[in-house]
């Protein structure tokens, strides 16, 4: 069964375009025996419900970390993650290992769009990329043991790709009573493509290959199919989930005109 879950919230009126904007979410559950599937679905649905109820005009940069924490609480409250942790780690069939001995958890990456900005907030190793003018930029960094070692200069990216600790998550929803989300704001431009994906894609397909596929495939449905096919061809055994969003137009003064995003 697929332990990934995708979701989005689109504005239903011109007023909501300005007051709410757009939200896109992707979660990759961990735990096996359907625990991961429950966790990822609960994470996305909790975030969707919270986003629909946001006060008018609230800043996404403060909202998204709060929604991540609400999703974390929902998973903890489900009763599958105890508040007191041991040092043991749990490995699920997909290979991911959770921090703190948790047996039900999920990654989560969110991208909210309004005016000329994209706010990205995440926990775990699900990613968000920005594709622009033939270049691909990662807007997130993985919360894994090897990624932290790379940032500290202890190992190289090549060593990390095959390292024994590459599946050990240092942060995940449901692993603790509080989880810290990393949040970033970037400007967006017409023609930009935002890509949310699970490690079922980036764990098997290089950033260069992802960039080439997105840049050479204008149709988002075909691009998504090509990305999944590339992951499978590379021997991917994990769930592969991809969400692509194209920015059609941006109004810097506070209005989007028309339907600015092409959602897959």
Language-model segments: what does each one mean?
Residues 1-264:
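PP2C/PPM-type serine/threonine phosphatase catalytic domain
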């Amino acid at each position: 069964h697929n332990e990934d879950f995708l979701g989005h919230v689109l504005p239903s009126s011109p007023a909501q375009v300005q007051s709410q904007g757009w939200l896109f979410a992707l979660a990759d559950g961990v735990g096996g025996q359907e625990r991961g599937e429950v966790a990822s679905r609960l994470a996305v649905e909790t975030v969707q419900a919270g986003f629909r109820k946001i006060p008018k005009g609230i800043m996404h940069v403060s909202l998204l970390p709060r929604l991540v924490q609400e999703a974390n609480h929902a998973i903890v409250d489900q009763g599958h993650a105890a508040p007191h942790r041991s040092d043991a780690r749990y490995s699920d069939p997909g290979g991911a290992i959770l921090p703190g001995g948790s047996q039900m958890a999920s990654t989560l990456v969110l991208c909210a769009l309004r005016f000329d900005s994209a706010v990205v907030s995440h926990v775990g190793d699900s990613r968000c990329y920005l594709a622009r003018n033939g270049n691909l930029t990662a807007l997130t960094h993985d919360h894994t043991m090897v990624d932290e070692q790379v940032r500290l200069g202890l190992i190289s990216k090549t060593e990390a790709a095959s390292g024994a600790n590459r599946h050990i998550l240092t942060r995940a929803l449901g692993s603790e009573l509080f989880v810290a989300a990393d949040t970033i704001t970037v400007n967006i431009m017409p023609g930009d493509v935002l890509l949310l994906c699970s490690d079922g894609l980036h764990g098997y397909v290089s950033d260069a290959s992802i960039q080439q596929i997105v840049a050479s495939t204008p149709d988002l449905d075909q691009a998504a199919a090509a990305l999944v096919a590339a992951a499978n061809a590379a021997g991917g055994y994990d769930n592969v989930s991809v969400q692509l969003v194209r920015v059609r137009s941006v109004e810097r003064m506070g209005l989007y005109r028309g339907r600015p995003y092409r959602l897959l």
